[in-house]
Amino acid sequence: AASDVYKRQVLTPQIELYGKTCGIFGLGAIGFAFAKMAQGFGMRVISYSRHKKTDPKYDFIEQVDFHTFLKESDVISIHAPLTPSTENTFDAEAFAKMKDGVILINTARGGLIVEEALADALRSGKVYGAGLDVMRDEPPKKDNPLFHLNNTSITAHIAWLTRASRLRAIDIAIENFKAYLNGTPTSVIN
């Protein structure tokens, strides 16, 4: 019944974000935007990224090595592309190095996480909870162990799916094409 859901939500221990450490994995445009949001909640923001950012706009973010990133983050938000060097980054070894009770968010690519290792970390309480908008297999297999855990919220790769975001994507594509035709392409990755 709805009242049971409400009672369960009220009784679930809440976590204060203020003063906690938010770790951003991948400090591109989306990771940077998320970092600003975390800062707005009064969080200390650290990041691990392949390339050190030197622009002064990144000064509020502590750029750290991967070991420090895992050890100090209370919340980890993943924003990196899936490449041969990032695939399976979040495996059993990485989860073991994290703080107890860390919260994990992945809106990037499912292949960055070893899902069985995440399921084990969630069952043990090492990871307090996970919010996943992406999975290794999409659509995911029915027997995926993450589906059977109460401390996991999974959406079907729909974070971008609002009507407004689709219209904005069309506008961005048009502007990017115009810039390309003018010899000034945007979002170039070398």
Which residues make up each language-model segment?
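Conserved beta-strand positions in the Rossmann-like core of class I SAM-dependent methyltransferases
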Residues: I46
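Glycine-rich Rossmann-fold phosphate-binding loop(s) that bind the pyrophosphate
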Residues: L27-G28
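Short, small-residue-biased leader/transition segments that mark boundaries at the very start
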Residues: A1-Y6
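Rossmann-like adenosine-cofactor binding region
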Residues: H51-P145
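Gly/Ala-rich phosphate-binding loop of Rossmann-like dinucleotide-binding domains
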Residues: A35, Q39, L122
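C-terminal helix-to-coil terminal segments
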Residues: L11-P13, R136-N190
